[in-house]
Amino acid sequence: MKNKILVTGGTSHLAKSLKKYLPDAIYINGRADLDLTNYSDTLEYFKRESPDHVLHLASKVGGIKSNMENPFEYFYDNLLINTNVFRACKELGIKRLTSILSTCVYPADNVEYPITEDNIILGDPEKTNRGYAQSKRILAELTDLYNQKYEGEYNYIIPCNLFGMEGSYDPNKTHFLTSLIYKSAKALSNGDAELEMFGSGKVLRQFVTYDDFARILVYCIDNNITESFNYSPDYNLSLIEYGKIIEDITDGRIKVKFNGNGPDGIYRKDADNRRMKLLATNFEFSDLKESIKEVLDFYLENDNI
């Protein structure tokens, strides 16, 4: 019999990709469906739907500026969401819970790169998103300790930065690469030759598409993968290098310039992907340059976004 899957965060960009591969799953589409900060409502909803597997995507997210200005809100709201989802799964005996974390859970200093899954609580996270990171760390600890005590099949996946065709553009919630692509499309539409981005451009980041990450989630379901792991590609590029890809795709019509203003965030946070490769031996990432071009074309064709 096919497992019944419940997905939190059904309006997220990742969920929009996931719906293409898991159309029959139950998606919680924001607070209109369920307020995950309310435990009694969460428990009642989960009890009524009675899923076999919960994919926990929901979280309060934002960019560096928003995280720096509101660390308490990011910690408190996400702590409520995560513990309520976890508690409901535990109380109802739901067999599988897969939670989505972020590489921001890893220490900012005194760590070897690429960073492995056993380094989550070995130092303080990057201060620019401390509140969000700490809430995700607690979720990882809950998962590990639950499995240790109950021999459970709960796990978490730690993806690198994601990008894709996000629809409406929100500068306060968008990662660098989607912002770069969106602004490049606007510059092309306006006939501008130079695009200015904040920061030094020297920091290193890994980016993969929402679609690719959705595919690995489905792969884990289909192959009953219950271990926790990092999800990341082999490359780790500077933001300047991502800018060069844009310049190449646009045949030099766009020149990307970094103005040196604003916080860069942590210099690097590339994740070790050896465990992922052992677990998902047949999985292949989409080509980065082609994926960036697809997103750029999307924004050019939808210039009202």
What label would you give each PLM region?
Residues 23-44:
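Adenosine-cofactor binding site in Rossmann-like domains, unifying the SAM/SAH pocket
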Residues 8, 29, 54-60, 97-103, ...:
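SDR active-site strand-loop-helix element
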Residues 40-79, 91:
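NAD(P)H-binding glycine-rich loop region in Rossmannoid oxidoreductase-like domains
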Residues 2-24:
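Canonical Rossmann dinucleotide-binding motif of NAD(H)/NADP(H)-dependent dehydrogenases/reductases
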Residues 12-13, 19-21, 186-305:
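C-terminal substrate-binding subdomain of Rossmann-fold SDR/epimerase-dehydratase oxidoreductases
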Residues 109-113, 117-118, 144-221, 245-247:
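NAD(P)-dependent short-chain dehydrogenase/reductase
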Residues 131, 135:
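Active-site helix of classical SDR
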Residues 83-129:
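Conserved Rossmann-fold NAD(P)-dependent oxidoreductase catalytic core, especially the SDR/UDP-sugar
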